[in-house]
Amino acid sequence: SARTLLMDINQQRWSKSLCELFEIPIDILPDIQSSTQLNIPLKPFELTLTTSVADQSAAFLACIGQHPTHASSSDRALINLGTGGFVMRSIKQPFPILTGYLQTLIYQPDHNTPQFAIEGTLNSIAAALARFPIKDCVIEDMASNDIFCIAEPSGLGAPYFRQDYGLFFSHSISTLTQQQIATLLLEAITFRIARIFEDFHRQWPVKEIYLSGGLSALPCLQQSIRQCVGIPVYYLQQKEASLQGTALLTYNTGNAFNQETMEITIQSKNERLLNKFLAWKKWLDNLLLTNI
């Protein structure tokens, strides 16, 4: 149901209106059950299914912890940068959902309150970076010009949901090198992440950020994110996070696994970067207002 989006997330049942919209008979859908203590025998395999959770939710549990209502979990945010990107943090219910952001059901404990998260998304960032020498980019080269950028080829994700702007530059880039363009794209990704973080932090303070996904290994991105958010940032080096999160939920472990983390410390302070971030926010707001 998390993938098909046919479930009414507030009622935890199939949405009649959505099923009608997509012409799906609601009576052919299976019963929605809790995520844990299922105890469904899989006789052909001589196994018992005890836990069911979506891969992204499982990875979130492995990285952040199982109990989003605990302060140690709700004060953390996860930034995953892969094919696309997302910034996610658990929320204490009832929280008003910030306009435009996604509300995600992490899991539904047996006979207990469902656990939710709020999420901002970046679309197709790997595609934007694919042909550029991003590994050669360094923090010192960021904010070295006044060109602003959007780096989401399939359109801006949450909270904007704007398909009219994808890969977009404020000025011509015809005279720039491939590495300079790559740096602009990394700036745009950093600024989108930092703005999502600002919204989350304003609603409820975030004390720690964890980075995961292939693109999060880029030193330039690690440094730029750390400098723009201004709180401790950790790079998660563990593998198979989805499998670890499923095991954590299955065995009802309250904390995340012993994480292989590396704290991102500021290696070279770029004084220009925060100023450009402030200017980028104004540019983006004006850009989106002119094309409503």
Regions found by a protein language model. Name each.
Residues 1-11, 31-43:
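Short beta-strand-loop/turn "lid" adjacent to the catalytic site in phosphate-handling enzymes
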Residues 6-21, 43-212, 217-292:
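Active-site core segments that coordinate phosphate-bearing ligands/cofactors
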Residues 16-37:
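A conserved helix-loop-beta module that forms one wall/lid of the active-site cleft
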